[in-house]
Amino acid sequence: MGFKFLEVIKPFCIILPEIEKPQRKIQFREKVLWTAITLFIFLVCCQIPLFGIMSSESADPFYWMRVIMASNRGTLMELGITPIVTSGLIMQLLAGAKLIEVGDTPKDRALFNGAQKLFGMIITIGQAVVYVMTGMYGDPSDMGAGICLLIIIQLFIASLIVLLLDELLQKGYGLGSGISLFIATNICETIVWKSFSPATVNTGRGTEFEGAVIALFHLLATRSDKVRALREAFYRPNLPNLMNLSATILVFGIVIYFQGFRVDLPIKSARYRGQYSSYPIKLFYTSNIPIILQSALVSGLYVISQMLAIRFRGNFFIGLLGVWEDVEGGGPARSYPVALCYYLSPPESFFSMFLDPIHGLLYITFMLGSCAFFSKTWIEVSGSAAKDVAKQLKEQQMVMRGHREKSMIHELNRYIPTAAAFGGLCIGALSVLADFIGAIGSGTGILLAVTIIYQYFEIFVKEQAEVGGMGTLLF
């Protein structure tokens, strides 16, 4: 049945544009160039406003998700990577649950990737329609059908560009994946901007700079009481401060430290005597996948909640999912404490837990539980479970030292499921910690940025080992 499903959608997959695999080995310098070009195109799209929108100044219900989903409100990158991540999540879960069957042949894998791309485009259209019809860019009746259609087309084309850029890197022309690159860039851009932004903000204390570092020097230069100026630079409310920046650096260090935790299982060649190696099982076995899936889940819930809240305002059951209110100044939309979306969003600060401890406890439980669950589930649907690793080692004619071939799965099962679940739990705990201590860019965003940067570091090290020397790599 699953095979028939993929065959049915095959004619539709053909009409989608596709990046061909390189016919030759791409040199490292070329990969760096293509990665830079991809990033440049993405950043340009982040700055081009959507044509035809009447307003994007209303409260933003997806404020907390934008950094993680690499989206920028009111621009071509409005949807960011959300359609790609959502389609990939759903297709992987369907394949893992055996609802659709995907073989190991290149033809089946290509068909599955095409179906994932097609599903992503369908999600893009659906999400764009929801955004337009719920009034995110103005009243649809005032804009007219033509302008509404034009906005949907712009969002569709922009998402297609993102999909092709991601495919370009994944096919081997660049480094890593487009999704990871865009997420890390968006998060790092947010951190740098909130640290060094020269923009000024009028507060009750006078005009201040938005950037935490620039604000420090400005306060020291303009305040006569230097001790008070330092205190204000470290603890000023409602604007980035040096405590936020210090918390961000602390979380970076903690995540990098935990990245080094792993168990090396000794393996040897079944064909050649004396050839020994090791198979590493990291603490973060599934890397940043749990937090990405958790973010996609919450983002989808926000979209549904916002749409239903607008269409069925005042409905009691819809209100249980999320009742949204606008914050003055076009700030992020928030939900009332009676709504589910409120309890799935991070508290404002650690001290907010004392004002509403139920919110804090439910948020912690949700983060830890969902990350552990997604991590444990992902190894089953992505081909990285114990049985899959044992199969890979067998194909490479490698066996674990001290164990027969048949007992490898049992030995791997002692480590891999535990590493996946506990690693996901640690990812969730670090995200909660970063949220509570006020790290810039949200706890989830910091974790994604660090893990992605670490992945790119490993790619550089691997390329260096293959080519030899950093000077050879770059010059």
From Swiss-Prot:
According to UniProt, the tissues expressing it are described as: Expressed predominantly in epidermal cells of the embryo.
Record has Transmembrane helix as a keyword:
yes
* Residue intervals passing through the bilayer: 33-53, 76-96, 118-138, 145-165, 173-193, 241-261, 289-309, 354-374, 420-440, 441-461
Q: Supply the Pfam families for this chain.
A: Plug_translocon (PF10559), SecY (PF00344)
What PROSITE patterns would the database entry show? SECY_1, SECY_2
* Cellular localization per UniProt: Endoplasmic reticulum membrane
Task: Name the Gene Ontology biological process terms.
Answer: pronephric nephron development; protein transport
UniProt lists the family membership as follows: Belongs to the SecY/SEC61-alpha family.
> Per its UniProt record, what PANTHER family does this chain match?
SECY/SEC61-ALPHA FAMILY MEMBER
Subunit structure, as described in the record? The SEC61 channel-forming translocon complex consists of channel-forming core components SEC61A1, SEC61B and SEC61G and different auxiliary components such as SEC62 and SEC63. The SEC61 channel associates with the multi-pass translocon (MPT) complex.
**What protein name does the entry list?**
Protein transport protein Sec61 subunit alpha
